Amino acid sequence: MQFVYDPLPYRVIFGAGSVRRVADELSHVGSRALVLSTPEQAGSAQELAATLGDKAVGLFSKAVMHVPVATVDAAAAVARELDADCTVAIGGGSTVGLAKALSLRLDLPSLVVPTTYAGSEVTPIWGLTEDGIKTTGRDKKVLPKVVVYDPDLTLSLPAEMSIASGLNAIAHAMEGLYAFDGNPIVSLMAEESIRALARSLPLIKADPTDAKARGDALYGCWLAGSVLGAASVALHHKLCHTLGGTFDMPHAQTHTAVLPHAIAYNAPSVPEAMERASRALGGGDPATKLYELAVGLGAEMSLAKLGMPKDGIAKAAALAVANPYPNPRPITEEGIVQLLSRAVEGLPPITA
């Protein structure tokens, strides 16, 4: 056995009511915090700022999707004016992305309080958008110093959004099982993530106020984000990035529809990873079980219904083959055409 494990340096506080610990945990980060949120969560941000007392020097509630450079400019100006020495971000991917951008630009450390299942708070991946062009990169300095997970803050997350985000997280974990730069710790986190999410998402669909299921789902998404931050992705993510960029398809829903087919494609080359996935999903063929899980949760499995033109299959396959991510099974145009043809129609995956 040979591997490299380079753990990411962040502190995690997890549990119902943990948001009450933010003021104490801020001592690990700084003493003059600029609190960040989207306009929609400004009220929650104000409440959080109030609990911080004089440790909160101001509020910036203009975070938006895709982290526009203009928004970062505005937030950086406020941070400088208030002499902030850190940020506290409450919300989902948009707010976390802004906190990361400020860490990158101003070296401001952050504390993050996630209220969605995005998982980006535990990855060193950052992104910025300017003039319609998105630039991404990896840098450990954008990682929050502290992440406070309070499942109670996710109780109001709509079930449909929870399911889409949760299935998206399963995709991160599944590919972590066979990442070329994976290791035993990543595999353990990935398997546990899949198990927690497969168990909790049906319960959330049945009762979105189920506090235990919400805790399980948030736990699973933390693990999935940790996997994404520690290991590379493969065919599944390449296909989803290609479809999203080429046909402007919805991110999480595209992941859900493609995943069973990508797993079926790679399964013959990664038997040990499939054993782990099967165990996490309660037995059986992982690709089939993932398809059945998604259908049972009411997810749309047809790429055509999500916006992909049927005449776009050949183009997508050519793009995927032209610049592939490292993958355990060789990627062929013929194989991808077959895979996408079934995903476009929403059919079950072809398994061995």
Curated annotation (Swiss-Prot):
Function: Catalyzes the NADH-dependent reduction of maleylacetate to beta-ketoadipate, a step in the degradation of gamma-hexachlorocyclohexane (gamma-HCH or lindane). Has an essential role in this assimilation pathway that allows S.japonicum UT26 to grow on gamma-HCH as the sole source of carbon and energy.
Keywords: NAD, Oxidoreductase
PANTHER family registered for this protein in UniProt: ALCOHOL DEHYDROGENASE, ALCOHOL DEHYDROGENASE 4
Reported phenotype of the disruption mutant: Cells lacking this gene lose the ability to grow on gamma-HCH; growth is restored when a plasmid containing the linF gene is introduced.
Swiss-Prot/TrEMBL GO biological process terms: hexachlorocyclohexane metabolic process
Binding, NAD(+): G93, S94, T115, T116, Y117, A118, G119
Gene Ontology molecular functions: alcohol dehydrogenase (NAD+) activity; maleylacetate reductase activity; metal ion binding
Cofactor, how bound (note): The maleylacetate reductase family of enzymes does not require any metal ion for activity, despite being related to the family III metal-dependent polyol dehydrogenases.
InterPro entries per the UniProt record, alphabetical: ADH_Fe/GldA (IPR001670), ADH_Fe_C (IPR056798), Alcohol_dehydrogenase_Fe (IPR039697), MAR (IPR034786)
Sequence similarity: Belongs to the iron-containing alcohol dehydrogenase family.
Pathway: Xenobiotic degradation; gamma-hexachlorocyclohexane degradation
CDD domains, alphabetized: MAR
Reaction(s) catalysed (UniProt annotation): 3-oxoadipate + NAD(+) = maleylacetate + NADH + H(+)
Protein name (database record): Maleylacetate reductase
Enzyme Commission number(s): 1.3.1.-
